[in-house]
Amino acid sequence: MKMTVDFEECLKDSPRFRAALEEVEGDVAELELKLDKLVKLCIAMIDTGKAFCVANKQFMNGIRDLAQYSSNDAVVETSLTKFSDSLQEMINFHTILFDQTQRSIKAQLQNFVKEDLRKFKDAKKQFEKVSEEKENALVKNAQVQRNKQHEVEEAANILTATRKCFRHIALDYVLQINVLQSKRRSEILKSMLSFMYAHLAFFHQGYDLFSELGPYMKDLGAQLDRLVVDAAKEKREMEQKHSTIQQKDFSSDDSKLEYNVDAANGIVMEGYLFKRASNAFKTWNRRWFSIQNNQLVYQKKFKDSPTVVVEDLRLCTVKHCEDIERRFCFEVVSPTKSCMLQADSEKLRQAWIKAVQTSIATAYREKGDESEKLDKKSSPSTGSLDSGNESKEKLLKGESALQRVQCIPGNTSCCDCGLADPRWASINLGITLCIECSGIHRSLGVHFSKVRSLTLDTWEPELLKLMCELGNDVINRVYEAKLEKMGVKKPQPGQRQEKEAYIRAKYVERKFVDKYSALLSPSEQEKRIISKSCEDQRLSHARASVHTPVKSNDSGIQQCSEDGRESLPSTVSANSLYEPEGERQESSVFLDSKHLNPGLQLYRASYEKNLPKMAEALAHGADVNWANSDENQATPLIQAVLGGSLVTCEFLLQNGANVNQRDVQGRGPLHHATVLGHTGQVCLFLKRGANQHATDEEGKDPLSIAVEAANADIVTLLRLARMNEEMRESEGLYGQPGDETYQDIFRDFSQMASNNPEKLNRFQQDSQKF
């Protein structure tokens, strides 16, 4: 340490010492002014940056509004949406930069000024005070008369004590000066280095973002050239069509008599009809009617949602009405109601009656139930009913979930009664159900079965992957293991009371599960597992290919295997050193189920990503929050994190796993996912209410761990979740459930973790580079 004030001169209290003190004190005063000024400028810069981010967000909202307005133009909508999302990501990077600037410059330098400079000032005051006391003692000692021996001794004693106190305080003051002079260099350089690293991360993230966007921008430039050519071509075609229509003869209404049961848009016939109201006045109103997808619907205005008159034409009849005063009337009669309609002419009436009759005959010949596909809304066509973008998106989501789940073995029929084409599912069991069985499952309570529609509800990607990992065949092998032995027959469709009794016995009482017996202790099971793994190592691969489904990883669905189950790639974790004590086996090796503890089975299967074994363990009464005392009180959910499987975590959470249960080191699932860099799992746990403020035995919370690891994605998720939590607390009980930006970003991360996990490997790739 380089001393700026000499201790020897301090003891002498020489003029050189006083001059050095004066120089140092002036330098410290000037340093304080400079630091105060820098902190104020930093605060102003941060405030200006936050205002910039707010204005930029408003600008992004304007771009999104323009994209929504251009929803009919796929190129414009896609481009604007992609650009706004990228710019929104840059705003998030700016927000992180300003936060790091506040911590590196403002917080550190303010702490230096308030703590270290304050100690210097306190030491200075004490030094000045004792210096004054020393001067007074010297003067008093010099003034005392020699003949007054008592006063001479008293003055000498006071002078000695004062000198001793002065030397002590002066040495402390010099030490404080030297420490301050040395520390200020490290504090200033440390804060500036942290500030520069924040900028480095900011520009690195921006470079990565726009590197991905660059090829798309080049393609868009090429599309713009083609758009100019296509626009000129469309203009010429419209001019030709305009001339053709002007020359057409409109004297005949034969075009209104046409109907087509095989129309591509699903509309058999459409046109205006008068409809008699069902009120007391029996008024007649003119409405636009159409026959489509085995339904008769009408609407008043183009933007109105269509009203369904007949939900299923197979249940109705059509007939002429000659007993009323108005002409050209006909009636559509269903089991619950009838509808009186009037055409504009006799030809139109006959055409409508024939169209309805033909649609009824066609509906009986069709095998599929086409009515559910439109969800009571029509397909868009020129001059037809408007289904709306929202219904189309919902339809696509429903069809996608239905098709992907039903391709799993056994899922084409109800898991409990065998009725074909089930449209409901139990997400914690991983099975498909008919509508009647789904109602019975719902009555059991969510702790037994969580029911969701395969066509009406929106499915998260991780939940859809979970359904594709299980299926009716897998679950029934567990919950119906003793069905034939007990001589019990499954209920048939339509038997409500028999179904209810059977489902309650199957899932609540678990009567048909092959119970375990002669359970071993966890430590004994561990020994047998290891010994059995050595014996069966030669056959483990063959058994796994027959009995064990493809292991899931923190990645997306790649392809459908031969049995219809969605196959996921199996990778070795890059953090293989971060495992509980004891060597892990590469494939699942279990004891005979008759001697296996369900809790340990669930624990091991969670690490091995073996969902069928996990479901079997839960069926045999395994506690989903079971803690392994031999491995630091780790839980199955923590094991799922160590195994790197997003789907396994989702399965445990759906079955009641505690997302905040911690091991002996004070680390919960969120801690472990952060340490391992599993971004998808971090996103999942935050959505399920994980406490990110919890600290482990080292006093570290997940955010501090992510910051130390420089994992930008996880840091972003944790800080957004924390900001959203603070916003909700500030808004009180009636606040919004979450910021829109927060929800959008978490939705994007969920989609990325399930479908494009390679994009979340930026942290590991960057670590390998350095």
UniProtKB/Swiss-Prot annotation:
Q: Which residues form a coiled coil?
A: none
ANK repeat boundaries?
632-661, 665-694, 698-727
Name all PH domain ranges. Answer: 266-361
Please provide the record's free-text comment about the domains of this protein. The ANK domains are required for interaction with RAB35.
Single GO MF annotation: zinc ion binding
Q: Which named protein is this?
A: Arf-GAP with coiled-coil, ANK repeat and PH domain-containing protein 2
| Activity regulation details | GAP activity stimulated by phosphatidylinositol 4,5-bisphosphate (PIP2) and phosphatidic acid.
Going by the UniProt record, its keywords in alphabetical order are:
ANK repeat, Cell membrane, Coiled coil, Endosome, GTPase activation, Membrane, Metal-binding, Phosphoprotein, Repeat, Zinc, Zinc-finger
**What top-level branch of life does the organism fall under?**
Eukaryota
The record's Gene Ontology cellular component field reads: endosome membrane; plasma membrane; ruffle
Which parts of this chain are annotated as the region Disordered? Answer: 371-391, 542-572
**Domain called Arf-GAP: residue spans:** 399-520
> According to its UniProt entry, what is the function of this protein?
GTPase-activating protein (GAP) for ADP ribosylation factor 6 (ARF6). Doesn't show GAP activity for RAB35.
Membrane topology, record value: Peripheral membrane protein
**Where is the BAR domain positioned along the sequence?**
1-226
Q: Where is the composition biased (Polar residues)?
A: 379-388, 550-561
One Pfam annotation, family name?
Answer: BAR_3
Return the SUPFAM superfamilies for the record: Ankyrin repeat, ArfGap/RecO-like zinc finger, BAR/IMD domain-like, PH domain-like
State where the C4-type zinc fingers lie.
414-437
CDD domains per UniProt: ArfGap_ACAP2, BAR_ACAP2, PH_ACAP
Q: Report quaternary structure and partners.
A: Interacts with RAB35 (GTP-bound form); the interaction is direct and probably recruits ACAP2 to membranes. Interacts with MICALL1; the interaction is indirect through RAB35.
Alphabetical GO biological process terms? actin filament-based process; cellular response to nerve growth factor stimulus; endocytic recycling
As for subcellular location, the record says: Endosome membrane; Cell membrane
What is the first-listed, main subcellular location in coarse terms?
membrane
